[in-house]
């Protein structure tokens, strides 16, 4: 089916206070799972071997641990995924933090990250686990970087449309800081949402049904952001069929030619229907 878009966007940034990590850098964009991460830490006796053992039990595509000149370098390659579906990816930064703790690397920010962010995607660590009839809140760490000895983690959160900005702040305010780290909340963007019974959604859905003959599937509601938010009475409307992994925001992202051709027909009908409203 063609999705309609929902959710408001929330950005957070986690900062270290005290950490033994020399540097940690990974990810390229905030709206995708951090899929590569390189970390440098002080060497400790037996730590390299313990890290390798911990990393071997993960779902990383690739990892490498090297020790030289009193430092250990960890390279981790995960699986990219769109920030609205982070559970489909493997977060290289999150897995690295997790393995550092499992390997016995005692560090304040490692503890903070694992307690507040971790490798889960539901926001439970910051008190934001929530789900409504349109879907669950998602949390995605997209970028990790080190500047002037401080590690920062850029976090993308997609908030279900029924959860208000004031509620979000109330839910997480007690979980934003402790002696090991702090999290800053950015602005919460307005959601884009149209009820199923609205004339706009009905016009678009009718176009889809008339072209495909599919009456089984209702319009999809997803957590993706969209530039349609910049205009009034506009909704994002595009092809994404259930059961198909399009590798959105990942390597080898694609769409089938047959789906593009079908989409053209749907758009033609949609324009006719919209003109009739």
What do the PLM-derived regions correspond to, one by one?
Residues 32-36, 68-70, 135, 148-151, ...:
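A short, glycine/Asx- and small/polar-enriched loop/turn
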Residues 2-7:
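Short, small-residue-biased leader/transition segments that mark boundaries at the very start
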Residues 67-79:
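Self-splicing inteins and homing endonuclease
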Residues 16-28, 59-61, 135-140:
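Short amphipathic beta-strand starts and helix->beta connectors
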Residues 77-148, 158-163, 167, 182-277:
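An extended, acidic, His-containing surface patch that forms the Zn2+-binding/catalytic region
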Residues 60-70, 106, 178-187:
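Conserved short beta-strand edge segments in small beta-sheet-based binding/regulatory domains
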Residues 47-60, 88-90, 101-102, 167-176:
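Short amphipathic alpha-helices in soluble, non-transmembrane regions
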């Amino acid at each position: 089916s063609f999705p309609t878009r929902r959710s408001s966007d929330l950005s957070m940034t986690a900062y270290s206070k005290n950490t033994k990590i020399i540097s940690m850098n990974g990810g390229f964009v905030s709206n995708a799972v951090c899929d590569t991460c390189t970390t440098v830490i002080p060497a400790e006796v037996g730590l390299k071997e313990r890290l390798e053992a911990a990393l071997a039990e993960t779902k990383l595509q690739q990892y490498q641990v090297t020790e030289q000149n009193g430092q250990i370098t960890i390279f981790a390659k995960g699986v990219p995924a769109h920030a609205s579906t982070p559970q489909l990816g493997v977060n290289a930064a999150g897995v690295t933090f997790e393995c550092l703790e499992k390997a016995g690397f005692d560090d304040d920010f490692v503890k903070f990250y694992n307690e507040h962010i971790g490798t889960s995607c539901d926001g439970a660590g910051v008190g934001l686990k929530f789900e409504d009839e349109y879907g669950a809140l998602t949390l995605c760490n997209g970028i990790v970087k080190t500047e002037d000895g401080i590690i920062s983690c850029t976090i993308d959160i997609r908030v279900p449309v029924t959860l208000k900005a004031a509620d979000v702040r109330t839910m997480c305010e007690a979980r934003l800081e402790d002696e090991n780290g702090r999290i800053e909340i950015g602005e919460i963007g307005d959601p884009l949402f149209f009820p199923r019974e609205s004339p706009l959604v009905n016009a678009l859905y009718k176009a889809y049904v008339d072209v495909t003959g599919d009456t089984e599937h209702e319009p999809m509601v997803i957590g993706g952001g969209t530039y349609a938010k910049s205009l009034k009475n506009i909704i994002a409307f595009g092809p994404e069929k259930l059961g198909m992994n399009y590798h959105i925001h990942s390597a080898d992202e694609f769409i089938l030619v047959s789906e593009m051709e079908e989409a053209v027909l749907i758009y033609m009908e949609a324009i006719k229907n919209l003109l009739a409203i």
